[in-house]
Amino acid sequence: MKVGMNLFLWTDDPADEAHLPLYARLKDMGFDGIELPIFNPDPEKFAQLGAQLDDLGLERTAITICNPENDPISPDASIRKAASERLERVVDSCEAVGSSLLGGPLYAAIGQFSGAGATEAEW
């Protein structure tokens, strides 16, 4: 079994180099990997972080969420398009950092509710 630590306990910007000492400490404590919150996708920054995590010997997975500005199930086509574009950047950031897994929820924005019950097609 492998044991990892979710970095959301400390930060929502894991690519910030100020957190490198924390990552080294987690490795020294015996953690096999870390789970990265990717809320501000930036493949270039995450590629740099990936190289640093390789040097530390830490494996990585990632998580993200959608918000109202990039809700994949919004009735507004421009918001759905923004969701698609953002999720592409998240996936690119995962690839750049060397993440083996991306978790969500990815299907809808956090905290967005229509207030309507399920339709017959949804039920």
Where on the chain are the PLM-derived regions?
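Short, Lys/Arg-rich amphipathic segments at extreme N-termini
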Residues: 4-14, 19-23
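Acidic-and-aromatic substrate-binding clefts and catalytic sites of carbohydrate-active enzymes
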Residues: 11-17, 36-48, 71-73, 110-114
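N-terminal amphipathic alpha-helix/helix-capping segment at the start of soluble metabolic enzymes
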Residues: 1-4, 53
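Acidic (Asp/Glu)-rich catalytic clusters
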Residues: 21-28, 43-64, 89-99
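A short, structure-level motif marking secondary-structure boundaries and short turns
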Residues: 6-8, 33-35, 74-76, 119-120
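Active-site acidic/histidine proton-transfer and metal-coordination neighborhood
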Residues: 77-123
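Hydrophobic faces of well-ordered beta-strands that scaffold small-molecule active sites
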Residues: 3-7, 32-36, 60-65, 102-104
